């Protein structure tokens, strides 16, 4: 049994597009394998901001295409129609047989059973699957005709440890991918998903979005227990930040306590909606001046923390100004 593993590397895809695209891509390949009667044991999809991945495990290396009887044109059809049928099936007229059915007498061709290698089938049909992938929002770039969420840079495609060979628009598949989105001259060969996953894990990148989400939740729990405060559960925001980052790092930030005079609801919407931050609350449900940021990197110098604190201070200054202005106006 074999493994099929595909990675589409692009510029950063917005979080709102990732979930639909990874599910749609997986379902399209599942449908292809079902139509072609290719069995598999397990299938899943993953995404990071730059990588869209599908994985099939326990795939058959080859399939047996069953014998079938293919109906052709009527025996009295024009010769051109008969020749077209012969060409499309790559047969001679001597291979045809006549059969009477309800609608008249027709030519038929008995197509014998044959074995087909799964790798050949993938090389033929994978580009068609990719072409049918629809995006809620897409773009074109350069002189290319491809519509994609963001510029597509490379396609890694491996079956049974071997690189698939097919073209998709301006790209040709290989068994390599970019290992650092910032430095696209750094590439590495991968022959299976296990080595791929381990490599990126060692680089601090969590390929599996479900594991990224679990990691963030566990870090929240650790911080909550240590600081003795409550982090409001917001699954929509949690899912969004999970798809924004690939190397999640939780930062505890603060804003000036003077902004606590602003109504809690305004503070929450300013942090959650505008900045994707997670506000914190004490045991009595009162909002605190500490908030959590899910960063996409280590903050060894403290610059990410400082930058986010400056941003939220500016946001809250605006919110305070408009709140005070509204209070001063009589209804």
Each language-model region and where it sits:
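Catalytic nucleotidyl-transfer cores of nucleotide-processing enzymes
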Residues: 231-331
């Amino acid at each position: 049994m074999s493994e099929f593993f595909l990675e589409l590397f692009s510029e950063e895809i917005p979080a709102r597009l990732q979930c639909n695209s990874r599910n749609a891509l997986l379902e399209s390949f599942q449908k292809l394998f079902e139509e072609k009667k290719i069995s598999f044991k397990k299938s899943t999809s993953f995404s990071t901001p730059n990588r869209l991945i599908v994985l099939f495990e326990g795939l058959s290396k080859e399939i047996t295409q069953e014998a079938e009887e293919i109906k052709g044109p009527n025996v009295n059809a024009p010769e051109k129609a008969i020749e077209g049928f012969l060409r499309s099936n790559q047969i001679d007229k001597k291979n045809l047989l006549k059969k009477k059915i309800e609608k008249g007498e027709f030519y038929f061709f008995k197509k014998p059973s044959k074995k087909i290698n799964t790798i050949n089938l993938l090389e033929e049909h994978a580009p068609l699957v990719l072409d049918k992938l629809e995006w809620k929002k897409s773009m074109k770039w350069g002189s290319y005709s491809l519509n994609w969420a963001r510029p597509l840079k490379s396609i890694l495609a491996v079956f049974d440890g071997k690189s698939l060979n097919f073209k998709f628009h301006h790209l040709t598949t290989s068994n390599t991918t970019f290992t650092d989105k910032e430095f696209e001259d750094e590439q590495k060969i991968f022959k299976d998903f296990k080595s791929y996953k381990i490599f990126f894990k060692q680089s601090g990148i969590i390929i599996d979005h479900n594991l990224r989400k679990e990691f963030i939740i566990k870090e929240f729990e650790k911080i909550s227990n240590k600081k003795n405060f409550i982090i409001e559960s917001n699954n929509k925001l949690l899912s969004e930040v999970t798809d924004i980052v690939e190397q999640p790092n939780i930062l505890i930030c603060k804003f000036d306590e003077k902004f606590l005079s602003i109504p809690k609801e305004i503070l929450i919407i300013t942090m959650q909606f505008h900045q994707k931050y997670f506000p914190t609350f004490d045991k009595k449900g009162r909002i605190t001046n500490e908030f959590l940021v899910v960063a996409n990197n280590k903050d060894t110098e403290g610059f990410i923390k400082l930058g986010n604190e400056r941003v939220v201070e500016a946001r809250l200054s605006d919110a305070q100004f408009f709140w005070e202005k509204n209070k001063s106006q009589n209804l």
